[in-house]
Amino acid sequence: MAAQNEQRPERIKTTPYLEGDVLSNDSGPLLSVFALQEIMQKVRQVQADYMTATREVDFTVPDVQKILDDIKTLAAEQVYKIVKIPSISFRHIVMQSRDRVLRVDTYYEEMSQVGDVITEDEPEKFYSTIIKKVRFIREKGSFILHDIPTRDHRGMEVAEPEVLGVEFKNVLPVLTAEHRAMIQNALDGSIIENGNVATRDVDVFIGACSEPIYRIYNRLQGYIEAVQLQELRNSIGWLGRLGQRKRITYSQEVLTDFRRQDTIWVLALQLPVNPQVVWDVPRSSIANLIMNIATCLPTGEYIAPNPRISSITLTQRITTTGPFAILTGSTPTAQQLNDVRKIYLALMFPGQIILDLKIDPGERMDPAVRMVAGVVGHLLFTAGGRFTNLTQDMARQLDIALNDYLLYMYNTRVQVKYGPTGEPLDFQMGRNQYDCNVFRADFATGTGYNGWATIDVEYRDPAPYVHAQRYIRYCGIDSRELINPTTYGIGMTYHCYNEMLRMLVAAGKDSEAAYFRSMLPFHMVRFARINQIINEDLHSVFSLPDDMFNALLPDLIAGAHQNADPVVLDVSWISLWFAFNRSFEPTHRNEMLEIAPLIESVYASELSVMKVDMRHLSLMQRRFPDVLIQARPSHFWKAVLNDSPEAVKAVMNLSHSHNFINIRDMMRWVLLPSLQPSLKLVLEEEAWAAANDFEDLMLTDQVYMHRDMLPEPRLDDIERFRQEGFYYTNMLEAPPEIDRVDQNTYEIARLQANMGQFRAALRRIMDDDDWVRFGGVLRTVRVKFFDARPPDDILQGLPFSYDTNEKGGLSYATIKYATETTIFYLIYNVEFSNTPDSLVLINPTYTMTKVFINKRIVERVRVGQILAVLNRRFVAYKGKMRIMDITQSLKMGTKLAAPTV
């Protein structure tokens, strides 16, 4: 080993990527991009078979580093707001009356403006609108009150008027002094009470809030008051176990501070991550593989062994004719070095990435390359037993190459006794008649390759991630051993290597046997490093589950295709020699190693939110078939994806699998029960619970057609008229009598339209002063206020669309029920100069559309009822209290260098 410390002479750089013993540096994200490019080339070959000639698919390779940065940004986002003043829930419209005003629930007013207009023939737009409305509820109600403005009144702490959630300042100027005093007395009674929540002092007061918004606020407050202490202990305890496995210490700096009495803390994410959530995503095996590489794989160098090993074994003679001696001085090209990367990726992800030989006409002409690859391939790869690094075809090609090498007797002739089968390696060699059949690949037992007579998969102490309990032991090496490259590997060996040395000696290849004997310590260090990388750094939620891992090899042999098929990468013959002569030596651990659990938790949480959204949307077609006549499951899949964070979509679609996901994949995923608990998921489920009543989303199927005259009152007493606060609306206080309602379904409308009697039938119903309800289709409802005559398209608008045209001598009719409906409020304003008939027209104005929603959107109230909506209990944290999101503490860790790195 002293030769390694000798002063080496300067070497001329023949290639830009060769520098001494170091060939190149590869980091996790860099290797993930490289792996993604190579994998995509294989995936595209399969995907191209499914593409039609006109279908365009974007096959650009995504930027993995940018995706990870976006997910980290997503983890820093808060799903709640910390505010001093809650949003206004009720506002008032001043009328000419001194004791009456219109009270408007601003939630319904704002909700009516969210989303697009629903139509029957655009189900994707309907699903997208529902998602937007549910998101509006969640975001509107996700607030925490902190340091609310208060004032002192006679020694009592009283809430400022803007905290109460009612806007009434525009009403005060028109009130009498008596009414203003009454409101002031009510405001002075808004006393702040001292409360105690989770051993923390808080302010409690009564305010106003709309029901759906308050449900979200109440759920968020309950989440905080539940303290999440056990969840935090579980997360920190699990991080400790993970840190021990991955050699990471997680900082307790933040956690020593949050227990103070002046701190309110919120834990928005939880650990450990439920791996089932990540692996249930359809066609996600490749995306998870890339994420595993990007977040966990260390940066490393490709180190060459001591050059004296080959000089004193393979090239000691002046003339060298052996295949090994010929290749000893060769230098890899850039493409061959890429193949070396593929080989080490396959070794680090056994079973998930397997290798095959690429067809290279140039190398078929050089038998020395094939022979050498046949020998080193049996020492580099595992083919069977529990997993494989090779395809069956490549294993057979390596067997044939080893067969040719053993029979290539360039030094001395050795006796050969051939077997009866004609299979590769079916012969015995040497004086002791060594049976070479044992080196022929057998995927059932692993014979002939590294897994031969070796326990290369072990289950021992429980791993932090429950889905991946296996420990990989290439060459039988235990990854818990500490590696000192100067001494490690000396005196170590394993069965396949011993048998290879015996067979080479029996074949008369003494120089090569001496070379491999000298390379054994370097070879053992190589696989010891790989074992440590697999069992420590690469252990994550993106690791392949044990049940899938155990099924990879049997499925490969049987030709069965499952959810996680292996990725096959092509390598050249000569790259096996270069891979054998290079070892991947980790130099720096992955930059994202300590924050990987947080990235995983964010990703799983967002997937759970998407799954909950899809479950509810999948029920829509059964609840409202009239508005989703043409709906397919792919529509709500696309709607949820469009409204999901870009980073999460990018991870799910790393291999462009979304272009090929079918309905079976989607529905299977939606129905699977696995979810990742988080604050965002809790609030999303509560928002859907609030949205189960579609009237809270300003959608209704209670829309009627009825001819009604717009009121034109005589102004005999203007003062009395003004005091009554006269207004008109097409909003019904109750549905019409059922015996006066004609249910006009699509089938009835089509029949009448075919007979050319659709308009006549409706006219007859209107003349009888009856009502028509057009199907059970949901409609988008808008709320508008007018203090003058509304436009005719609102006053005389019909709750359906009916168009006729003629083409080719035939008459066609188009009927649509899902149109936008407007609830309007017309406030009458008069002046003392008006005459009694100022509002009277010769011809009356008719309104045709009536709407019934069982919600108090707008109501006329007396002045004394302005504050009657103060009926919600609010909890506000005092200004001197700190509200701290301790989610970020789950990533505050420091990587420990391996003792020998």
Swiss-Prot record:
Superkingdom to which the source organism belongs: Viruses
Which residue spans traverse the membrane? none
What InterPro entries does the database record attribute to this sequence?
Inner_layer_core_VP3_Orbivir, Inner_layer_core_VP3_Reovir
- Extract the GO molecular function terms from the UniProt entry: structural molecule activity
Please provide the record's keywords in A-Z order.
Answer: Capsid protein, Inner capsid protein, T=2 icosahedral capsid protein, Virion
Which SUPFAM superfamilies does the annotation name?
Reovirus inner layer core protein p3
A single Gene Ontology CC annotation of this entry is: virion component
Cellular compartments annotated: Virion
Report the Pfam families cross-referenced here. Answer: Orbi_VP3
**Record's miscellaneous remark:** Function inferred by structural homology with BTV-fold inner capsid family.
Entry's family note: Belongs to the turreted BTV-fold inner capsid family.
**Function, please?**
Inner capsid protein that self-assembles to form an icosahedral capsid with a T=2 symmetry, which consists of 120 copies of VP2, with channels at each of its five-fold vertices. This capsid constitutes the innermost concentric layer of the viral mature particle.
Partners and quaternary state?
Homodecamer; each decamer is made up of two conformers of VP2, called VP2A and VP2B. 12 homodecamers assemble to form an icosahedral capsid.
Q: What is this protein called?
A: Inner capsid protein VP3
Q: Which organism is it from?
A: Bluetongue virus 13 (isolate USA)
Gene designation: Segment-3
